[in-house]
């Protein structure tokens, strides 16, 4: 026997309110929890960092970018005549600088390949002199430095037969090349006439394609275009995939499949302006710039927070960068490896030029044992990089690199013999990232400072509204129906009448049962 139907005292309007308020209340509470877990402000920021038209990142990469400051310091030789004559056995130097320039960079042939998930472009860099950040105008200051061309060529010829060395000696006398030159800083950086180079350019234009030698002029050689291909996949965003179509450094034997290794491939290599979002301390990172002719190894060092909000991961240039180890062994194929130094010759027209930290920081003391005036200091000459760990933006950079000529046994050459077996420092460059613009600071402040409070406030409001709606829905279930004629009639129709019908049905069934019982009794009698 079925039980009597329960009496529903809710009106049709109240039932609709109950469903609406319950559904909306649950949705608002769920939305509040989602806002706290997902952090929508960071999601919006990541959206703007996509490389698609209309985003901030796309605008930046397709516009002229005010890049890093590059400060040049020259190693002025203070005892040139005494050292060349043999009166002094030690080379004395002191740094002159800074002469600061700012990079202006724009990317040509810009292409976003969404199907392959890569970004392609050709970086083009010009520099502008910054007098307010310099000690003087470069053209107004003379310095005395080692003649890079003569010392490098003499070193290159030191392993050649006697007749080749004799030819160089004859050319040195004919063109009156000196192992030490005194030049304006501007000429040293941007080009000065060196007779040996001019002769080499005429004799072998395919090898030496320039007549004047300038340190920055060679480093910012825009005549040698190269194309970068970067990943756009979330986990490897902005990682270098290819340079000029190659997935490794062709200068360091990448084209030989038997010599490929982490050393000459772009594994974990980035150009340095941005990285994948959500970095972890365990994630390996290397830096690649064409001018370095290699990857720079960096190590996680710690964290810090900027006053406008970002939480930064701090990395330092690793000692592994300038020591012989599995990550650098491919770099030892040309003129060999020396601790504290890195060979640049494959990218410097095969001339023996080596890179180091400024003042040979991190190199063993024997590298500069015959040089006075070298004072390595981690604070001044080390490399530090700070990256926003949530969004992957590089916000602080400071590093140095020094150009040196590792002079071999050049006693066969009268002009260069005083420098035999000395690694001669020519100049070093300090690269620093400019302070981020105010509008970028404001964006980070919104993401890291105001954003979280706004999310908490909105989440609290959503949760309160949702719980309030659920509470009013619960009240609808327990609120008595108002005693109006319509309500009473409804109760009578929907509640009392079914009960009366049910009671009447029960009475009829009981009567029939009693009649049945009497009938059975009569039969037995």
Name what the model sees in each region.
Residues 1-3, 522-525:
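A positional/structural detector of protein chain ends, strongest at the extreme C-terminus
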Residues 2-306, 310-311, 318-393, 398-517:
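Extracellular or lumenal secretory-pathway regions
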């Amino acid at each position: 026997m079925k039980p009597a139907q329960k009496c529903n005292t809710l009106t049709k309007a109240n039932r609709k309110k109950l469903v609406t308020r319950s559904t909306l209340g649950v949705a608002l509470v769920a939305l509040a929890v989602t806002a706290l877990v997902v952090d929508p402000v960071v999601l919006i920021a990541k959206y703007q960092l996509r490389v698609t038209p209309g985003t901030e990142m796309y605008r930046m990469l397709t516009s002229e970018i005010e890049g890093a400051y590059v400060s040049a310091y020259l190693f002025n030789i203070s005892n040139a005549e005494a050292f060349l004559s043999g009166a002094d056995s030690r080379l004395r130097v002191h740094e002159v600088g800074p002469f600061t320039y700012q990079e202006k960079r724009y990317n040509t042939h810009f292409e976003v390949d969404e199907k392959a998930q890569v970004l392609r472009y050709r970086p083009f860099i010009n520099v502008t002199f910054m007098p307010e950040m310099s000690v003087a105008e470069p053209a107004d200051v003379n310095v005395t430095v080692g003649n890079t061309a003569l010392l490098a060529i003499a070193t290159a010829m030191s392993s050649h037969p006697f007749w080749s060395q004799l030819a160089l000696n004859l050319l040195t006398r004919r063109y009156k090349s000196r192992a030490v030159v005194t030049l304006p800083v501007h000429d040293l950086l941007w080009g000065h006439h060196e007779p040996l180079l001019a002769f080499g350019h005429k004799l072998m234009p395919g090898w030496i394609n320039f007549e004047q030698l300038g340190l920055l002029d060679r480093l910012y050689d825009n005549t040698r275009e190269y194309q970068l291909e970067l990943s756009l996949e979330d986990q490897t965003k902005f990682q270098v995939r290819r340079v000029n179509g190659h997935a490794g450094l062709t200068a360091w034997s990448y084209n030989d499949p038997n010599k490929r290794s982490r050393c000459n491939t772009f594994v974990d290599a980035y150009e340095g302006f941005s990285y994948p979002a959500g970095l972890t301390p365990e994630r390996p990172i290397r830096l690649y710039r064409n001018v370095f002719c290699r990857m720079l190894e960096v190590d996680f060092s710690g964290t810090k927070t900027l006053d406008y909000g970002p939480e930064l991961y701090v990395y330092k240039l690793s000692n592994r960068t300038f020591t012989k180890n599995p990550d650098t062994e491919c770099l030892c194929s040309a003129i060999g490896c020396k601790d504290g130094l890195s060979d640049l010759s494959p990218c410097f027209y095969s001339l023996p030029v080596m890179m180091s930290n400024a003042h040979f920081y991190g190199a063993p003391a024997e590298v500069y044992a015959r040089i006075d005036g070298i004072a390595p200091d981690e604070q001044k000459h080390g490399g530090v990089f700070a990256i926003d760990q949530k969004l992957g933006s590089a916000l602080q950079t400071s590093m140095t690199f020094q150009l040196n000529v590792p002079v071999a046994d050049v006693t066969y050459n009268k002009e260069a013999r005083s420098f035999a077996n000395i690694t001669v420092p020519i100049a070093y460059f300090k690269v620093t990232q400019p302070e981020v613009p105010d509008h970028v600071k404001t964006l980070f402040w919104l993401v890291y400072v105001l954003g979280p409070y706004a999310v908490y406030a909105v989440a609290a409001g959503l949760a309160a509204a949702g719980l309030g709606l659920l509470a009013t829905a619960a009240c609808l279930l327990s609120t008595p129906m108002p005693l109006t004629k319509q309500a009473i009639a409804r109760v009578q129709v929907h509640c009392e009448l079914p009960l009366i019908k049910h009671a009447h049905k029960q009475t009829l069934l009981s009567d029939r049962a009693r009649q049945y019982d009497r009938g059975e009794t009569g039969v037995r009698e």
